[in-house]
Amino acid sequence: MENGALNQGEGKDPSSFLSDIIGSRVIVKLNNSLVFKGELQSVDGYMNIALEKCEEWVHGKKKTVHGDAFVRGNNVMYISADDSA
């Protein structure tokens, strides 16, 4: 890591990158446009994701606080770091 920033790692596969950022805050956007923000707790080979301190966001506004959430990998459009935390 350089200057404390998350290094996406050139040549790394996505599951290795996600394993490296376990414990960090992430944004998960689903194929149906729902957005979840939370702390990444685990990811498996199917890209299934477990989040803690999870919040559901709709149209840029926090809708619901779920606490813990499990997201099935085939529903995920993208995962990114949550720099707003």
From Swiss-Prot:
Signal peptide: none
A Gene Ontology term for the protein's cellular component: U4/U6 x U5 tri-snRNP complex
Domain Sm: 13-85
Gene3D superfamilies found in the cross-reference section: 2.30.30.100
Subcellular locations according to the entry: Cytoplasm; Nucleus
Highest taxon, organism lineage: Eukaryota
Listed Pfam families: LSM
Classification via SUPFAM superfamilies: Sm-like ribonucleoproteins
Matches recorded under CDD domains: LSm6
Ribonucleoprotein in keyword set: yes
Keyword Nucleus attached: yes
Keywords: Cytoplasm, mRNA processing, mRNA splicing, Nucleus, Ribonucleoprotein, RNA-binding, rRNA processing, Spliceosome, tRNA processing
GO molecular function: RNA binding
InterPro entries found in the cross-reference section: Lsm6/sSmF, LSM_dom_sf, Sm, Sm_dom_euk/arc
UniProt GO BP: maturation of SSU-rRNA; mRNA splicing, via spliceosome; tRNA processing
Family to which this protein belongs: Belongs to the snRNP Sm proteins family. SmF/LSm6 subfamily.
Entry function: Component of LSm protein complexes, which are involved in RNA processing and may function in a chaperone-like manner, facilitating the efficient association of RNA processing factors with their substrates. Component of the cytoplasmic LSM1-LSM7 complex, which is thought to be involved in mRNA degradation by activating the decapping step in the 5'-to-3' mRNA decay pathway. Component of the nuclear LSM2-LSM8 complex, which is involved in splicing of nuclear mRNAs.
Quaternary structure and interacting proteins, as annotated: Component of the heptameric LSM1-LSM7 complex, which consists of lsm1, lsm2, lsm3, lsm4, lsm5, lsm6 and lsm7. Component of the heptameric LSM2-LSM8 complex, which consists of lsm2, lsm3, lsm4, lsm5, lsm6, lsm7 and lsm8. The LSm subunits form a seven-membered ring structure with a doughnut shape.
Name by which UniProt lists this protein: U6 snRNA-associated Sm-like protein LSm6
